[in-house]
Amino acid sequence: MTTESGSDSESKPDQEAEPQEAAGPQGQAGAQPGPEPAGGNGSLNGEKQQPALEQFPEAAAHSTPVKREIGDKDRDFAAAAAKQLEYQQFEDDKLSQRSSSSKLSRSPLKIVKRPKSMQCKVTLLDGSEYGCDVDKRSRGQVLFDKVCEHLNLLEKDYFGLTYRDAENQKNWLDPAKEIKKQIRSGAWHFSFNVKFYPPDPAQLSEDITRYYLCLQLRDDIVSGRLPCSFVTLALLGSYTVQSELGDYDPDECGNDYISEFRFAPNHTKELEDKVIELHKSHRGMTPAEAEMHFLENAKKLSMYGVDLHHAKDSEGVEIMLGVCASGLLIYRDRLRINRFAWPKVLKISYKRNNFYIKIRPGEFEQFESTIGFKLPNHRAAKRLWKVCVEHHTFFRLLLPEAPPKKFLTLGSKFRYSGRTQAQTRRASALIDRPAPYFERSSSKRYTMSRSLDGASVSENHEIYMKDSVSAAEVGTGQYATTKGISQTNLITTVTPEKKAEEERVEEEDRRKKAEEATPVTALRHEGKTDSERTDTAADGETSATESDQEEDAEIKAQDLDKTQDELMKHQTNISELKRTFLETSTETALTNEWEKRLSTSPVRLAARQEDAPMIEPLVPEETKQSSGEKLMDGSEILSLLESARKPTEFIGGVSSTTQSWVQKLETKTEPVEAEVESTPHPQPLSTEKVLQETILVEERHVMSVHASGDASHTARDEVDAAESTPTDRRHTGKGKEGSSVTEAAKEQRGEEVDQSAPEQEQPATVSHEEEQASTIRTSEGLEQKSHFESSTVRVESTSVGSISPGGAKLEISTKEVPVVHTETKTITYESSQVDPGADLEPGVLMSAQTITSETTSTTTTTHITKTVKGGISETRIEKRIVITGDADIDHDQALAQAIKEAKEQHPDMSVTKVVVHKETEITPEDGED
């Protein structure tokens, strides 16, 4: 069977004339087989057409009439022409039936189906719903563009659409993939959410973008995903009210004008009162300004922009993996135990339900280390991997990485298909339109509080971590070797995407390199356990594509991005507001209630390391110490501690769970007042070494009154399991607010200071020196409700000291100071609430760990112990920070600053004890101090 091509059939009408005229009396015979082509293959063509006529009898009967004998020549010619036209119609029908693969030609009566459209419902950030119809075969980008057009949103790269799968897990809608392939069953219901939280919301171009970011953060706070203190809740709530309602008007605003708003998971009348009080102080602030202040405070929260995923480590311990702009965060028992900045991550991959992180080797390492985690199932592993790929691409790369184009590839082809943050910022700078008008909706939608997993409000303290039986073993497994990351490798949330920013960071790093070494040095010494040497074969994997030079510069300058000007600006902005906020709570009952709310507010996971040296945006008790203020005697120290000694009362349903935060305790030390001069000979009043120790011991809630003895024991017994001279602090004037000088205290205290900095004080102790050691102890909840049977204690102690040697750090030789005269004085201030019998019952030591990190100017030693006594689980984190300086340091100022820092970093605790130990060693050369 032969099928003629379309080009041959189309050329036949042009060739019909010549054969038809040349046929003459044989026109009928020539007409029947059809026209001959110019090549003279008429007979062959006729033979081919005859079987075709036999195979289609209906078409042949229709197109070929019965032959009739007509004598007239003209009628024969006309009949032949008519038959030729009918035959051409037959040829067209035959070609359409034989050559076409379309089913429509075979079934001309069948109705063509139009593409099916699907009804979509999108829940917006203000609680309203937006409905639209999209083609069933549309990609996710089509629906997302419709939603953004409805919202009049141009800076849309920070946002995305989410949907719930069959397991009720949140998934991000892939804009490059068809919607029907992502939602296999069920209705097409989506939620519009912020996908990438901008590290600096001030860089957003339009107010409408910041407004939707505020809506997302308010929902995060109400749902418990973004925990913050009671003070922060009140301040953010006041900005929310100012943004939506404007200035406070006593004529229009009644006592309950904000009762319809929802500010916190545990919304209370006390919170409303504080919000109203702060709202009155915002008079004249525009809605856009209020939202900017809201974002400036919210971005400093520890959980800002962190996407949490449940997982288990190699030992089967429940952890949480958080993905944010700066990298990967690892939480265990609400403690951030590790962080992997994007420059340190070499590759992320998954295989089945395992998720792997390959870490770039350090300066003194030869091989990469791979850490594996186990997720609930393979879908959760892939979901986490995709989130990591998108965050890394958006925040770190200048251009998105193209998916692999090979036909056969191993692993997933998924890559982030949107614009990066660098591209978004460039596009935002080109926006040229009037500021869009939009209505700021009310907060009536916040009627029910929910936690991350749908738990009730009383379980909000447990939403991030599940309490584990092995929670006491803080220093086990791979985290014992990698825990130094969280104390030294500080990461700023603003990651540079442009070469200019990178060059600026490198220049700043070179300028400050002489003052402090790279904080990542502790990373270099971390060992690799067997659990880290995991197979990296994965179903999906991606690699960081930055150059090594960029990564090294990024790591070295992580904690140098924030300048002193930014710190002072932040302190001025926040502290002034908090002072007016706190000055209103003058009554004792109100203060106790205030501290009670602080203790029961959602726990901050950490003082944001990425914003170091920024302090927590809100502190309940601000210690006003100017830069030149001094503590000349004990009365001023007592005044600092007076407001923090009130007992707190815990109300809630939280079981005993460790709530110590290593990274919060290890945020920063005082800036070095002066560099150490490398002078081998002592100069009077020219060289001085300052030892500032910050011992932070903290636990969270206390049980009942009968357990206050254990709590008081914790408050009194400062000495950790790693310390060798515990008797000094126990016997220096306990219960007295005066001074007691004992020779044993002098000698033991001197030895203790020496042990706190083993690599620095050997030459310093022999030389002439002045020691000032102070211990600030803060304890929370020494008086509790008797109906609690089990809880934990949070205790904080800070120690500040100074050593003034007659030479440089380690260059001093002992032959320069043959004789040392020592004068010692010890002053102890202690709260009368401490139980005198607290230290009689020993605790059972569950775990102990010591972490030491050192730079050119700072040595940090952290002792972490966990004990259980009397049904109370107590975690003690004692930190000593030794700062070396070369100037005439004001020791009283250093003490005041340490107290201030301790209260700023831990606002939910009260100071109960201060020990000032001053030891002056006089050499014959220097004379008496």
Curated annotation (Swiss-Prot):
Residue span of region Hydrophilic: 402-528
Modified residues (Phosphothreonine): T495, T518, T545, T725, T923
Keywords assigned: Acetylation, Actin-binding, Apoptosis, Cell junction, Cell membrane, Cytoplasm, Cytoskeleton, Membrane, Phosphoprotein, Tumor suppressor
One CC-aspect GO term: cell-cell junction
Tissue-specificity statement: Detected in brain (at protein level). Highest expression in brain, lower in testis, adrenal gland, heart and kidney. Also present in muscle and epithelial cells. Isoform 1 is expressed in brain, isoform 2 is expressed in heart and isoform 3 is mostly expressed in kidney but also in heart and brain. Isoform 6 seems to be most abundant in kidney while isoform 4 and isoform 5 are predominantly expressed in heart and brain.
Modified residues annotated as N-acetylmethionine in this record: M1
Residue ranges, compositional bias (Basic and acidic residues): 496-516, 523-536, 726-737
Main location: cytoplasm
Low complexity bias (residue ranges): 20-33, 789-802
Recorded GO MF terms: actin binding; cytoskeletal protein-membrane anchor activity; structural constituent of cytoskeleton
Disordered: region residues: 1-72, 490-554, 608-630, 665-689, 705-807
Modified residues (N-acetylthreonine): T2
Region named C-terminal (CTD): 777-929
Gene3D superfamilies: 1.20.80.10, Phosphatidylinositol 3-kinase Catalytic Subunit, Chain A, domain 1, Pleckstrin-homology domain (PH domain)/Phosphotyrosine-binding domain (PTB)
Function of the molecule: Tumor suppressor that inhibits cell proliferation and promotes apoptosis. Modulates the activity of protein arginine N-methyltransferases, including PRMT3 and PRMT5.
PANTHER family documented for this protein: 4.1 G PROTEIN (PTHR23280), BAND 4.1-LIKE PROTEIN 3 (PTHR23280:SF20)
Name of this chain's protein: Band 4.1-like protein 3
Species this chain originates from: Mus musculus
Gene label: Epb41l3
